[in-house]
A protein has these predicted regions:
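Conserved acyl-donor/pantetheine-binding loop and adjacent beta-alpha core of acyl/acetyltransferases
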Residues: 58-77
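Short, charged beta->alpha transition segments
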Residues: 65, 100-103, 127-128
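Terminal substrate-recognition subdomain of acyl/acetyltransferases
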Residues: 106-107, 114-169, 274, 279-321
Length: 321
């Protein structure tokens, strides 16, 4: 297999493959949100047939080319249409796809490469063997098959307490269609935490991508004032928690959890199978997501940099390089 940029004539085939074998984050309607900085790449078999793909968000800092995931995008792929049937042949086919991806990174040689893989990819030896730093990350996946009462029962005592307190204190959770409300709460939270957020990309997700068929939001209110928000995107199988925020002056320990539980119930009622919390390795955030009862699920990021840069990064980003 080999990886190369897509031609315009490949777009329809790529999107069909992404629909069948990828996630919503591989589809054109998502990739197009990020303009020229997002590059979609095709994965071609030995006969030149397009069988899959991946995406790379290209950035520049201090004149250096950096490849990474796009904002609000959990993974870059790759995805492909499998042909093999034998277990050994399936393994070899998957590794061929990863080898092709590694070939492309090494051939293009960006100064820094930090690409998160699809969580379904658990065999990352092709990258390890070729000198990439393979870093495990974790998300939490919640099976939506149980009834809401069972889902609540499976949460941690702390999370159940949070949700119960929200109800006892008179907080009300509502579906929110005015995504300006979500934006305000999300931006306020990022600013308080002194974290950078790309507002252009945030607005693209909320106001260009989001529609009733692919997303929903819930807010928790006190006396009609929104004090916490939860925004979710989804395909036909999986709901992805993408954005959340809270009002600092009106914060309540149960407000965020109540909005999240409403989103979980809504995803279940919509017939979705899994709720993906898009987890974090930051201890406090990881503990919060864990409390909702999901299954810890690893996914991997592959990192590589020019040697002088990699040596420098070992001092500031030891966990990644």
């Amino acid at each position: 297999m080999n990886v190369r940029p897509l031609e315009s004539a490949d777009r329809a085939t790529y999107d069909e493959l992404a629909l069948r074998h990828g996630t919503l984050f591989n589809r054109w309607d998502w990739l197009d949100l990020f303009g020229d900085r997002m590059q979609a790449l095709g994965l071609f078999d030995e006969g030149g047939t397009l069988v899959g793909g991946l995406s790379i968000f290209q950035d520049r800092r201090l004149g250096l080319r950096i490849w990474r995931r796009a904002p609000f995008t959990p993974s870059c792929g790759p995805f492909f249409a499998p042909k093999a049937q034998n277990p050994v042949a399936i393994l070899e086919e998957r590794r061929a796809a990863l080898d092709a991806m590694a070939d492309h990174v090494e051939r293009e040689a960006p100064a820094i490469c930090m690409l998160p893989l699809d969580r379904r990819i658990q065999d990352v030896l092709p990258f390890f063997w070729r000198g990439f730093k393979v870093v495990p990350n974790y998300t939490y996946l919640l099976d939506l098959a149980p009834a809401p009462e069972e889902l609540l029962k499976n949460m941690s005592p702390e999370r159940r307490k949070n949700i119960g307190k929200a109800g006892r204190d008179g907080l009300v959770v509502r579906a929110e269609t005015d995504l300006r409300v979500v934006r305000e709460l999300v931006l306020g939270t990022f600013r308080r935490q002194e974290k950078f957020v790309d507002e252009t990309c945030l607005d693209a997700v909320l106001f260009r991508y989001a529609r009733p068929s692919n997303s929903f939001a819930f807010v928790t209110c006190r006396d009609e004032m929104p004090i916490a928000a939860c925004f979710v995107v989804h395909d036909g199988q999986t709901a992805y928690y993408l954005l959340g925020g809270y009002h600092a002056a009106e914060r309540h320990h149960g407000a965020g959890a109540a909005a999240m539980f409403a989103a979980i119930r809504h995803a279940r009622d919509a017939g979705l199978k899994t709720f993906d919390f898009e987890g974090s390795v930051i201890p406090a955030i990881e503990r919060y997501f864990r409390g909702f009862g999901g299954q810890a699920t690893p996914y991997f990021t592959i990192n590589k940099a020019w040697l002088p840069i990699e040596i420098a990064l070992k001092f500031s980003k030891r966990n990644f390089f």
